[in-house]
Amino acid sequence: VNYSTPQTHASYGVVRVLTAQKKLSMFNMITCYVVLFNDRLVLAHITPEFQKAESARKSAEIRASGTGFFKGSAEMMRFWSYYHKKYETMSPPAILAECPMNMEIPYNMISQLLFRAYEEGDEDSSSSGGDLNISLSNGNVIKLKHKHDHSKALNNDLQSLLGFRLKYKK
């Protein structure tokens, strides 16, 4: 879904990439990266088919380099743990072209973005996460779950992009 008109490549600038989970059905969740640009956000969905294709591509790369099993396994884990970083250098059209589910939303189409963060547990075993709900001016709401903890820098980034439309709760 494309809610905006194309812009020149010079206006692109990724502010931050957030990792989230999107619930498709009762037992089906997929990873979704929220790529925050200066003028819009882009949702990049990692569907099972897309993940399988990316894993196959990386496996072929690892095999072609002659890397052994253990180093290859470590390389594959590293690939997926830093996968979100690739979006820091991609343009919105390139992200949208990856998967038909991907969508871009200009900030002026967002009536409210609710970011709720929590931290549980003690020093040794704490967990963090929360909700990221994007309410659109057409009445639709995109509901995501995230694993980010409260961060003043994140709050500041979201505040600078969304202003009064941001509801940040910890």
Protein language model features and the residues they cover:
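Acidic, Ser/Thr- and proline-rich intrinsically disordered linker/docking segments
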Residues: 2-14, 23-32, 36-170
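Divalent-cation-coordinating short motifs within acidic/hydroxyl- or histidine-rich contexts, strongest
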Residues: 17-18
